[in-house]
A protein has these predicted regions:
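N-terminal Rossmann NAD(P)H-binding glycine-rich loop of SDR-like oxidoreductase domains
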Residues: 2-24
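Basic side chains
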Residues: 2-3, 33, 49
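Residues at the starts of beta-strands that form the adenosine-phosphate
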Residues: 3, 27, 86-87
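Active-site-adjacent beta-strand anchor residues
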Residues: 7, 31, 68
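Conserved glycine-rich Rossmann-like NAD(P)H-binding loop of the short-chain dehydrogenase/reductase
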Residues: 27-33
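NAD(P)H-binding glycine-rich loop region in Rossmannoid oxidoreductase-like domains
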Residues: 36-38, 43-87
Length: 89
């Protein structure tokens, strides 16, 4: 089963992305602060994208859907926090 990481995953676009991939049979992980209810069927990685402290370094994802980035610095910093991954969207 392919593993996908979705940043956010509780509101707006990221919620629907997480739901879509759960329904498509992916193993879906969401990264968020756990301040809102989670989509049924996802696995929560609780954290703030701006202060991850290496929690993703030992994980592999086939796809990373970074929905919550606002600028290039957000993207660069997040990619540097990731372990290995296949595709980054």
């Amino acid at each position: 089963m392919k593993k996908i990481l979705v940043t956010g995953g509780t509101t707006f676009v990221s919620k629907y992305v997480a739901e879509y991939f759960v329904n498509a049979g992916y193993e879906v992980y969401v990264l968020n602060r756990n301040s809102k209810s989670q989509v049924q069927g996802v696995k929560l990685i609780q954290g703030d994208r701006h202060n991850l402290g290496g929690i993703l370094k030992d994980m592999f994802f086939d796809v990373v859907a970074d929905i919550t980035a606002y600028n290039a610095t957000d993207i660069i910093d997040f990619v540097n926090e990731l372990g290995s991954f296949g595709q980054y969207i």
